[in-house]
Amino acid sequence: MTDYLVRAIAKSGSVRALVCVTTATVGEICKRHDTLPTATAALGRGITAGALMGSLVKTGQRVALRFEGNGPLKKIVIEADANGSVRGYVGDPKVHLLRPDGALDVNNALGRAGFLTVAKDLGLKEPYRGTVQLYTSGIAEDLALYLVESEQIPSAVGIAEFIEQDGTVAAVGGFLIQAVPPVDPLVVEELMTRIEQLPPLSELLHEGGNPEQILEQLLAGIPYDILEKRNIAFACSCSRERIERVLLSMGKKELSSMKKDQHGSEVTCEFCGERYLFDEADLDRIIAEIAKQES
């Protein structure tokens, strides 16, 4: 089934909500990185967070999330855009930690101490950046803290996954609810109560709940309009041409040394695992191009 996100706003204009299912996208990305179950859960949460944040920027803009902790997973890096494209990776895909009750321990895998940095490429000279300390290292709570502290928007975020014992991605999804200025404290209180009473999100997802059905439960009793429905999918912007531009920037001396010592160059994209091979003839051509630019 195609992953997608719905965006809605209360008819009163006081609340906006985003709900998405990312199961297929997470499955594809985790397969590319050959992740173990806990790393799969962590990456799945990050991808979902990225999809939610990507829907808040305008066409042509991008957002990057970087969760860095002191645990064995080390980091979760996600990039997403306004079109629903998302990509990501973790520092160590082979991390697999369990809590005493047998649940996947994403929090300690990432590490309790660390930071979340959000960078938005809004088409300006420099991207906008905001950083907060990790709150729980569970991803959803950390993103909510960022939105409240850095963007000053009262927000509630829920992200959940259902990973089978064999590591298969059975269901992943999430929601983001925000109070729209001027903020009504009573509306915020009502929403928080409603979220607390919601059945476990992982159960709703595993039972086949789609974004519209989850949205209906989140905003039960609150009249709302669905503004948009957009597909979410893995997409990587890497290409041989981009890698070649990086090699061009390295200079003749380093490329000549690479040719002599390694007889070529192999570059692997961290986001998708695609391998790009440049043999000695390729390096000679790039070195010649540098010489031409310098003359």
From Swiss-Prot:
Q: List the disulfide bonds.
A: 236-238, 269-272
Q: Which UniProt keywords apply?
A: Chaperone, Cytoplasm, Disulfide bond, Redox-active center, Zinc
GO MF annotation terms? protein folding chaperone; unfolded protein binding
Location relative to the cell: Cytoplasm
InterPro entries associated with the record: Heat_shock_Hsp33, Heat_shock_Hsp33_C, Heat_shock_Hsp33_N
Pfam families the UniProt entry points to? HSP33 (PF01430)
Tagged with keyword Chaperone: yes
Report the PTM annotation: Under oxidizing conditions two disulfide bonds are formed involving the reactive cysteines. Under reducing conditions zinc is bound to the reactive cysteines and the protein is inactive.
Keyword Cytoplasm in the entry? The reply is yes
- One GO cellular component term, please give it: cytoplasm
Tell me the GO BP annotations in alphabetical order.
Answer: protein refolding
Q: Which family does it belong to?
A: Belongs to the HSP33 family.
Stated role: Redox regulated molecular chaperone. Protects both thermally unfolding and oxidatively damaged proteins from irreversible aggregation. Plays an important role in the bacterial defense system toward oxidative stress.
Protein name per Swiss-Prot or TrEMBL? 33 kDa chaperonin
Originating species:
Geobacter sp. (strain M21)
Q: Give the source lineage, highest ranks first.
A: Bacteria, Pseudomonadati, Thermodesulfobacteriota, Desulfuromonadia, Geobacterales
- UniProt lists the gene as hslO
